[in-house]
Amino acid sequence: GQRRLLVVLEGASLETVKVGKTFELLNCDKHKALLLRRGRDPGEVRPDITHQSLLMLMDSPLNRAGLLQVYIHTQKNVLIEVNPQTRIPRTFDRFCGLMVQLLHKLSVRAADGPQKLLKVIKNPINDHLPVGCMKIGTSFAVPNVTNLRELVPIAEPVTIVVGAFAHGSVNVDYTEKMVSISNYPLSAALTCAKITTAFEEVWGVV
């Protein structure tokens, strides 16, 4: 029951598509015609949201201090555990390549050892969260704004669910409460940055 923050990036748009002989990560810019042919809204296919959010989370002092654990749950119901040691590729193209590898091989190992940096794990997410830990969803639709610092527990773990999709609100069945953290709609990446900053301030991580 020691203190740490668990973040679930919910509804992430991570799926592969076969183009010629290779697989690519489906995205709205590169595969617009293909998406329209399949009757899908390209505006919803936004893996860049997950990429930007992961950069914010994994680069944070909170993560460097060993107080953060990140999970990704995709629109296709794939659950991914992100090892805190993972260095997320800076460029979107390289991130896409990494995700294709992960989705097909179910894990990605470190270049310099046997350690798995990213791995697909069994649903549901609840099986992987600390027993009895508070689970909070974030949504712009909640009327009253909560000061993030008030959500930071003194000494126990807490889970915060952040929507990694373009439009809509987090709608999962395992959160105990929903909070809004700003009077303005925030991007997922900015939400992640604000959350980690609040936890760093309260827990004295500088």
Where are these regions (language model features)?
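RNA substrate-binding interface of SAM-dependent RNA methyltransferases
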Residues: G1-N144, E200-V205
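Surface-exposed beta-strand edges and their flanking turn/coil or helix-capping segments
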Residues: G20-T22, Q85, E150-L151, T175, ...
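Conserved binding-pocket/active-site segment within a compact domain
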Residues: N123-N183
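Structured adenosyl-cofactor binding patch, chiefly the S-adenosyl-L-methionine
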Residues: A166-V206
